[in-house]
């Protein structure tokens, strides 16, 4: 016994419902296809925009890529305070070595809305680049 009259969903209605669920899953995970190919900063911006927009704290992610720049995995490395997140090279590079990533990209937000890199941002980037070079990762900092 049902709650109301039974209605069948036709092919078009079923396809629309399936598409709606797919969009909901994509929005809920806040990311594009996990195997997305990263071609540049725009792809990263789209991948993290929704998650960073609502964040009240600084969040630092590492995105691990294969040889064709497809996402193998992404990891939240650190969640900090309003204006800082502690990041150590071993927390970023260790997983890259374990999963045999060809390369990686790191991203973080500025909850203040000011996109200008801080002195600490430059220092962390420099430490990560130096540690990465010693392990065979090429730096592509621009």
Where are these regions (language model features)?
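Short beta-strand scaffold segments in enzyme catalytic cores
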Residues: 60-64, 141-142
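Divalent-metal-activated hydrolytic enzyme cores
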Residues: 126-142
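Long, highly charged, low-complexity intrinsically disordered interaction regions
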Residues: 1-3
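Long, charged amphipathic helices and adjacent flexible linkers at domain junctions
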Residues: 24, 28-48
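Short HxH-centered metal-ligating active-site micro-motif
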Residues: 79-120
């Amino acid at each position: 016994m049902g709650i109301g009259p039974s209605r069948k969903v036709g092919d078009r209605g079923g396809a629309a419902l399936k598409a709606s669920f797919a969009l909901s899953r994509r929005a809920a995970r806040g990311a594009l296809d996990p195997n997305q190919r990263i071609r540049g900063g725009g792809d990263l911006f789209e991948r993290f925009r929704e998650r960073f927009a609502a964040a009240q704290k600084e969040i630092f992610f590492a995105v691990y890529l294969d040889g064709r720049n497809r996402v193998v995995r992404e990891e939240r490395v650190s969640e900090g305070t309003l204006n800082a997140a502690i990041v150590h090279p071993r927390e970023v590079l260790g997983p890259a070595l374990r999963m045999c990533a060809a390369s990686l990209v790191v991203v973080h937000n500025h909850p203040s809305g000011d996109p200008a890199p801080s002195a600490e941002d430059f220092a962390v980037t420099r430490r990560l680049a130096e540690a990465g070079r010693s392990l065979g990762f090429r730096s592509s900092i621009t």
